[in-house]
Amino acid sequence: MSQLDLGTQSLELERFPPQENSNTLQAWEAADEYLLQNIDLSQIDGRPVLVFNDQFGTLACALHAYRPFSSSDSYMSQLATAHNLRLNHLDESAVTLLSSVDDLPEAPKLVVIKIPKALALLEHQLRALRRVVAPDTVIIAGAKSRDVHNSTLQLFEKILGPTKTTLAWKKARLIHCEVADIPLADAPETIDWPLPNTDYIIHNHANVFSRNNLDIGARFFMEILPYDVTGKIADLGCGNGVVGLIALEQNPLAEMLFVDESYMAVASSELNITVNRPQDLSRCEFMVSHGLAGVERESLQLVLCNPPFHQQHAVSDHVAWQMFCDAKRCLKAGGELMIVGNRHLDYFHKLKRLFGNCETLDSNQKFMVLKSVKQASSRSEGGGSGSLDMSYSDF
């Protein structure tokens, strides 16, 4: 937990999900401070205030008195925003949480943007803004200086209007943009490409990992996916759903759950099944969730996972660890977790400690595919759909 002093208010902010041994990672950054110092609150006239990509809810908490709309592709960021509003005893209902696929409010007076990691997501958001902004909408964006490039400024200028940047402050930089009536060619909502060695066409929304081609880890994983599994299979952290798509084809008696914390990932997965295997839609469920938090314990036969080892710009295997613990809770006795991961992450020993067993199914110079089986003697993980009661530090 860290404290952000804004002069007129002080906020206690925490990263989400809460992590042990995370004292070096705070829930806000200099760009948040810089943005809040440079917003002229006197300009807010009762029209909507709109915030984008507020990772842990810092901006929403600071601007809660103006009842902001907060748009994000990340369900985890939405949970973090709600968590930090509660932590500061602020009214959760004062902030309207929007997903990246929701419509934006018309004619906002103030738009505050944290520059996202993916330039394609920024372009999507700026194009969505163009459809709703008014001539007097105030637009201000911020990021670490290293993340504000000429291409970033050019996007603002091409889509919205004249753009200028500030001097750096604490290694952060701001962007000010004016709305202008400029011509702009249409752009498709998704991009598509053929999936190698299949007849499938993959469609990706803006914020999907490895948007322009097949992720090399997924490619390696897909080569050894099992056949003829019965019961329910989860593609955990599904991205665009390519792993689940192949699993769906190879396991005609199974049901498939696609789950991710990215709204655009889940939307892409659903689109890819609809386009490529419409006959199998009745066997599929699509869920935006924090891991398997919404899934009943001991309900899955197989969990497939290509876990992330970053949370935005921070390197961390905490999210992957939560996925593994969730998988153990949700697997039936005898059910299997199969993962693909970079060799240097040492998932083998973590899974062996958690499940009591781990097998290397395949490996190359960069990746390993591992399998763990849930034993019938595994200790009870509790009921309902909560997380496994086990600390990361235990391992």
UniProtKB/Swiss-Prot annotation:
One of its GO terms (molecular function) is rRNA (guanine-N2-)-methyltransferase activity. It catalyses: guanosine(1835) in 23S rRNA + S-adenosyl-L-methionine = N(2)-methylguanosine(1835) in 23S rRNA + S-adenosyl-L-homocysteine + H(+). It is found in: Cytoplasm. One of its GO terms (biological process) is rRNA base methylation. It comes from the Bacteria. The keyword ATP-binding does not apply. Its main location: cytoplasm. Its EC number is 2.1.1.174. Keywords: Cytoplasm, Methyltransferase, rRNA processing, S-adenosyl-L-methionine, Transferase. Specifically methylates the guanine in position 1835 (m2G1835) of 23S rRNA. This is Ribosomal RNA large subunit methyltransferase G. The gene is rlmG.
